């Protein structure tokens, strides 16, 4: 039997540490970011990091060029008079085109150019249903009075479809034999994520320092942000794991009861946490201790001006505290009704045990 009459195996979940913050550390570009998740139970960062990485690289939906037609060209193993690049080079360049489809599963785009000029991706004709991300991508170089007329086939998908398997593309099965004349397949890389790596560091919860911190380093192709990539991967994992989740009624009731108990307090239970759990610098921690600020609920009621008037407390310490409070969805200068509550030490201990 999986359950007895009194105790559910799922009740053990209540004792696990749950992440309290997700931070996004961005580089200068919108395509690269570090996503930081903490605290996690020891070993969980490795499990989650590996699962999220694999899903982001293999299962996210994106858009890619899966084929082209060039006027006057019947196959890729040829060249075009007056064009510097061979058709093979043009095909490889088209494989690097990154685009985004909005409300459409596939699209045919047109490119018409006349030399002398460099033909860039930004010269492709688009509409509201399709946008080009890397508009500076070089497609080819045209000589004097040379014309290039190209049809570009774009579709949504996931993973990678090489030209050796292009006949598996369902869209090609809808094309007539006449339409397939001159069709040149392109290696289709649909994944919007270029690179993902992760590392695990120690995280601190109060006086406990053996918890995990997961840091995901993500680089996308610009069609989505790293935050969106993590969000999509997490949702995919959630959907795949849903069938394994038990319908244990007693566990659900305990979850509802726990949630209702938090609401009965009349304020955010995070306020019952001690400032020792905020992982502040020694200077900031000592300043709060000297001012008899024990709980986060005590701290948030202080204004910035009051904090700056504290001895040895400067702007750097203020910014540090504001950043930590922001991760909890809190700020300085808040008005907390009925604070401090009666038996605050007992409530704080109860809240810690529930976490």
Swiss-Prot record:
Region listing for Alpha C-terminal domain (alpha-CTD), in residue ranges: 267-355
A cellular-component GO term for this protein: cytoplasm
Tagged with keyword ATP-binding: no
Keyword match Nucleotidyltransferase: yes
BP GO annotations: DNA-templated transcription
Gene3D superfamilies documented for this protein: 5' to 3' exonuclease, C-terminal subdomain, DNA-directed RNA polymerase, insert domain, RNA polymerase, RBP11-like subunit
Catalysed reaction equations from the record: RNA(n) + a ribonucleoside 5'-triphosphate = RNA(n+1) + diphosphate
Region Alpha N-terminal domain (alpha-NTD), residue ranges: 1-248
UniProt xrefs under Pfam families: RNA_pol_A_bac, RNA_pol_A_CTD, RNA_pol_L
Coiled coil segments of this chain: none
Enzyme Commission number: 2.7.7.6
Keyword list, A-Z: DNA-directed RNA polymerase, Nucleotidyltransferase, Transcription, Transferase
GO molecular function terms attached to this record: DNA binding; DNA-directed RNA polymerase activity; protein dimerization activity
Family: Belongs to the RNA polymerase alpha chain family.
Quaternary structure (record): Homodimer. The RNAP catalytic core consists of 2 alpha, 1 beta, 1 beta' and 1 omega subunit. When a sigma factor is associated with the core the holoenzyme is formed, which can initiate transcription.
Domain notes: The N-terminal domain is essential for RNAP assembly and basal transcription, whereas the C-terminal domain is involved in interaction with transcriptional regulators and with upstream promoter elements.
Function: DNA-dependent RNA polymerase catalyzes the transcription of DNA into RNA using the four ribonucleoside triphosphates as substrates.
Protein name (database record): DNA-directed RNA polymerase subunit alpha
Underlying gene: rpoA
């Amino acid at each position: 039997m999986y359950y007895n009459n009194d105790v559910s195996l799922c009740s053990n979940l209540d004792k696990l540490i749950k992440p309290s913050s997700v931070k996004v550390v961005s580089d200068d570009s919108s395509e690269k970011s570090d996503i930081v998740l903490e605290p996690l139970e020891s070993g969980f960062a490795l499990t989650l990091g590996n699962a999220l990485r694999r899903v982001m690289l293999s299962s996210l939906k994106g858009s890619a060029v899966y084929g082209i037609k060039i006027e006057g060209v019947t196959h890729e193993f040829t060249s075009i008079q007056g064009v510097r690049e061979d058709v093979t080079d043009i095909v490889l360049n088209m494989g690097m085109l990154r685009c985004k489809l909005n409300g459409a599963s596939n699209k045919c785009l047109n490119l018409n150019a006349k030399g002398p000029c460099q033909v860039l991706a930004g010269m492709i004709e688009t509409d509201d249903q399709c946008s080009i991300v890397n508009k500076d991508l070089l497609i080819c170089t045209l000589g004097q009075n040379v014309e290039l007329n190209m049809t570009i086939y774009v579709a949504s998908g996931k993973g990678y479809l090489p030209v050796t398997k292009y006949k598996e593309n369902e869209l090609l099965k809808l094309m007539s034999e006449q339409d397939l004349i001159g069709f040149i397949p392109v290696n289709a890389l649909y994944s919007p994520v270029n690179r993902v790596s992760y590392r695990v560091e120690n995280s601190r919860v109060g006086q406990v320092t053996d918890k995990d911190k997961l840091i995901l380093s993500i680089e996308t192709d610009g069609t989505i942000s790293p935050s969106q990539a993590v969000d999509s991967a997490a949702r995919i994992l959630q959907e795949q794991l849903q069938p394994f989740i038990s319908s244990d009624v007693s566990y659900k009731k305990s979850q509802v009861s726990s949630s209702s108990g938090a609401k009965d307090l009349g304020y955010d239970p995070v306020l019952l946490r001690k400032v020792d759990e905020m992982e502040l610098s020694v200077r900031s921690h000592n300043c709060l201790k000297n001012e008899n600020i024990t709980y986060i609920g005590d701290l948030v009621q202080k204004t910035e001006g009051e904090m700056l008037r504290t001895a040895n407390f400067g702007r750097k310490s203020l910014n540090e505290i504001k950043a930590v409070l922001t991760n909890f969805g809190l700020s300085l200068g808040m008005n907390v009704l009925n604070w401090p509550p009666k038996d605050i030490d007992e409530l704080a201990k109860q809240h810690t045990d529930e976490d």
